[in-house]
Amino acid sequence: MPATNQGWPEDFGFQLGGSGPCFVIEVAEGSSAHAGGLRPGDQILEVEGLAVGGLSRERIVRLARRCPRVPPSLGVLPGPEGGPTALTAAWLTRRFGRSLPLSRELLRLAGGPRPDAVHRERRRKAQEFSCQVDDILGDRLTAKEQVFTALKQFAAEQRVDELVWTLTLVLPSEAQGPVLDNLRIFIPKKHRARFDEVVSQGLLGKLCRARRAQGAQRLRRSRSEERPERLLVSTRASAAPRRPDEPPPRKATSLLGGRTGPGGPRRTVRVYKGNKSFGFTLRGHGPVWIESVLPGSPAENASLKSGDRILFLNGLDMRNCSHDKVVSMLQGSGAMPTLVVEEGPVPFASDSDSLDSPTRASALTSLQWVADILPSSIRVQGRTFSQQLDHLLTPPERYGVCRALERFFQHRNIDTLIVDVYPVLDTPAKQVLWQFLYQLLTYEEQELCQEKIACFLGYTAMTEPESSLDLEPESTPEPTPEPQPRSSLRASSMCRRSLRSQGLETSLSCGPGDCPEMPLPLIPGERQAGDGTSLPETPNPKMMSAVYAELESRLNSSFKGKIGTMSKSRASPPVPSLVGTSGPRTLSGVSWPSDRLLPSPCYDPLCSGGLASPSSSESHPYASLDSSRAPSPQPGLGSIHADSPPSPDPIRPPSRRKLFAFSRPVRSRDTDRFLDALSEQLGPRLSIVDDFLTPENDYEEMSFHDDQGSFVTNERSSASECVSSSEEGSSLTYSSISDHIPPPPLSPPPPPPLPFHDPKPSSRTSDGPRGPPQSLTKPLTQINHPVPPPPPPPLPPPVPCAPPMLSRGVGHRRSETSHMSVKRLRWEQVENSEGTIWGQLGEDSDYDKLSDMVKYLDLELHFGTQKPPKPVPGPEPFRKKEVVEILSHKKAYNTSILLAHLKLTPGELRQVLMSMEPRRLEPAHLAQLLLFAPDADEEQRYQAFREAPGRLSEPDQFVLQMLSVPEYKTRLRSLHFQATLQEKTEEIRGSLECLRQASLELKNSRKLAKILEFVLAMGNYLNDGQPKTNKTTGFKINFLTELNSTKTVDGKSTFLHILAKSLSQHFPELLGFAQDLPTVPLAAKVNQRALTGDLADLHDTVSEIQVACQSMAPSSEDRFAVVMASFLETAQPALRALDGLQREAMEELGKALAFFGEDSKATTSEAFFGIFSEFMSKFERALSDLQAGDGPRSSGMVSPLAW
């Protein structure tokens, strides 16, 4: 090899050509380039790590000759004639017609030769495979790219099923066989068995054909039809419309013994794994399924196969459990778990819609079944649920939504679902997904979810189907208004929700023909509130139905006989038509019979005719305690009450925007998370009020000045309802033109009215600027009735609204001013905080957030000095029917849970006990029935209720019926013994074998005997001073556990370390004595007394069953004697074998005890074997310390044994 690079590349035996990129033209045989692996056709990509793929030959030569390394390292792309990457790289070079970027695979050459034997064969196969793909697919470049993408994905993920699935979809059917056969050489050996199984059986092809046929034959209504293993626990709302002759959906309940769909046959298997692993791999989720089974494993011995779904484990339902939970349950299932599996093909997460993109990675994730849970027939805006998730959400957001749905399917908690999903669906476009989520709920959950969304978010049309709207088209044309700001509530959506509300009761009722229900057309430039793309920002009028109903009941009770006809016809209130006086803009809507506007009176408690106290706001949730006088309607235009005085000219308030305030619900983690997420979405337009509002006023809307635009005309602002706040700070102020919610009625004054005295104005300010009301064209009674009823008693003049002043902090007025007295903290204030930590806190803007947070810590409840008011005694609750309970509370509770889990009626369970065929009873069920069975005293008390079982509770009635079965407890014990005999015998046999084998190992171990002799010699030397005088002939073996307690003089070493060091120097063959005693540590864990007791219990149970068989005569109904007699005949040989093994084990144990000089009557097996187990572990630890060089040593001393 040359000493320098000046003659590169000719001196190294190869030549370059090309003007960018450059290729190896010729390589001399036997040269250093040939030995380094260069071949003709290789493309030069790197020189000493520098990218040279686009450089000419001359520049590459100059660069290489300046390199200090001889020869310079090259990064090349093998040509079509060689290299393991020829399969992919050669095709890609032809495909794109240019050199590959440096991120592709590179073959690094550093002077070492290439292996020829295996690589040459693989190169040849790769070339053949590449040519074969070219011949089969021809010019279909997309299909070629999918094939090689699948190969690359398999190289990264090693998923055989996905590789075969992709090739099955891409390649023609006649070409699949040859291509898969030639592809087998590239499959690693550990995956070839699975590859051969999938290819030979054609599982994926069958699955694909079955799914295509299934999708063409029927319209899928729910995911439960595709996944029969899922339990139907309640009624599901069908997404597709039903035919008129189709029966309504029926509520289905799960049965343990039944099947919910056309799944494969089920079978019960018992896996005898002992201390081994199961020997299978699991995949999937709810239920999990077996992907592969290892040959010779316990799973294969139990006849488990690939594709089996695990439905039950030891009687526990695993059909809806997650993958991690099933794995943890299997790990703790014991030595012989019982599985109920369902046969079927290997599940694969794909749908008919996914055939166009077979290599989608999301189709194989663990949560993909959530995205595919709705059938493809359910589409919104032309997309399915899965497609909308991919289109609208990012991968983290998709995972969050699917994870939230997964948790919801487990606990069925609507609140948690809303809290988890709402922060993700934060834009109008994303809120289309609510329409899909609505289809996954039961009918009861749909109503609850709709109510909660309306309560928290203020809209319902997002989740209501369009079919629920029953509106007639507008008959008369309306002038086209200008677009309104999107933040306001559309009049049409408000009217639709008002018309849909069946329970909305108001004090204003329209007579027949007076108030025709007409839809409001949408304003151009605005969206309908139910189109799935907008989020209304105003409260739902349905929420005010409770307020209207209460106020109307008070009004009707006071005016009984005068306006009784108003309650006959209850319809949704029409929306007044508002006409601007200073501009051409109008708002389309349902108009009153009159062309003029309705008033917007300002309600005040003084209108009731008396002086209101602070507590009088309870009688009217809309009442204001402001003592300022409210303006009356304009003179000459009528008013609500004839005797009301006129008001001055109205003052036009400035433009305002809405600020929403939500009263905090009951404190919980879910509500806190939801309100935090809500505040992040609505930002400064949300204020969380921590006062205890009544249910009638649990939603607040406050107004504030708009400094950033979104103005409305003064005429429109003057038409807003002016409702002042109460003393507690709860207010309901509608200040937008779009809030066409009629005001609640006035409470009638109690007769006779008190004289009114105008008080001085209060210092309190209202929540926002008040718009003066305008007048009525007619009295209100004339609007609703052709003939006006007698007028009510005259009212005192109302108090005018407060001046337009704004207090942004009114939302927290209750918590700041009217909280109870609390204990004071007796701290000493710092006079000068400048330069201290307290001065830094004052500069931190987070202190205001902490101050707001403190208000919700319920400090008044913990440190309050005022006693809470005593609860008012309410009406006596309805007394339930008295029942007699005989079982203890714990037994009754557990019996109820067991009955709900068994899904068996008392009659069915009685039939099982009489026939002695417990097909639906697991050993765990039988053990629980035995545990909760009544004792003798309880059985005696049950005799008094033989004639009147209805007086007993449900668990007691069940026990009473079970006591009618002859020898109830004996039958349960017999069935439990029959189900667990094999498991118990194997456990006892294993323990006895362990004792016998450990005894033989101790007696036959020559290494252990040599070590004991060495210890004896060392001890005699230390005890007597001379090795051959007055020596001890033996010692108790329990001294072996105390060897590490004898310290050396310096305290840095022990007798055990000296023993290990001496043995390693003079008898190294004795250091592995523990290998001759592998069973001793296991025998130390066997409890001899418990083992003997278990064997005695088996014989006692057999004797009891034999006596029961003799006492109970067989009959057509009672098969106890026949079944158990046959069982005992088969069980006797196993019991006799156990007895023989026990005698042999005890005999060997006694010999071992005598061999080591121990008393067989005073020493137990666990103590005897525990001594040797502890000695072995301590000796290994000491030896490890010495070998690691960190063991304690005696400095400056030479061991007397190191001769």
UniProtKB/Swiss-Prot annotation:
Signal peptide, first to last residue: none
PDZ domain: residues covered: 1-79, 268-345
Bias-annotated ranges (Polar residues): 500-509, 774-784
Organs and tissues of expression: Isoform 1 is expressed in the cerebellum, but not in the cerebral cortex. Isoform 2 is expressed in the cell body of purkinge cells of the cerebellum and weakly expressed in the cerebrum and the brainstem as well as various nuclei of the thalamus. Isoform 2 is highly expressed in the cerebral cortex than in the cerebellum. Isoform 3 is expressed in the cerebellum and cerebrum.
One GO term (biological process): actin cytoskeleton organization
Span of domain FH2: 812-1203
SMART domains xref list: FH2, PDZ
InterPro entries to which the protein is assigned, alphabetical: FH2_Formin, FH2_Formin_sf, Formin_Homology, PDZ, PDZ_sf
One GO location term (cellular component): postsynaptic density, intracellular component
Gene3D superfamilies named in the record: 1.20.1160.20, 2.30.42.10, Formin, FH2 domain
Keywords: Cell membrane, Cell projection, Lipoprotein, Membrane, Palmitate, Phosphoprotein, Postsynaptic cell membrane, Repeat, Synapse
Membrane-spanning intervals of the chain: none
Positions of region (Disordered): 215-270, 466-541, 563-586, 611-656, 710-821
Residues recorded with modification Phosphoserine: 303, 572, 613, 644, 647
UniProt biased composition (Low complexity): 231-241, 611-625, 715-740
Additional notes on this entry: Isoform 1 shows a punctate distribution throughout the cytoplasm when expressed in COS cells, whereas isoform 2 is enriched at the edges of the plasma membranes. When expressed in cultured hippocampal neurons, isoform 1 forms clusters mainly in the dendritic shafts, whereas isoform 2 is preferentially expressed in spines.
Complex and partners: Interacts with C-terminus of the glutamate receptor GRID2 via PDZ domain. Isoform 2 also interacts with Profilin-2/PFN2 and with the monocarboxylate transporter SLC16A7 via PDZ domain. The interaction of isoform 2 with GRID2 is dependent on GRID2 phosphorylation by PKA.
UniProt protein name: Delphilin
Organism encoding this protein: Mus musculus (Mouse)
Gene: Grid2ip
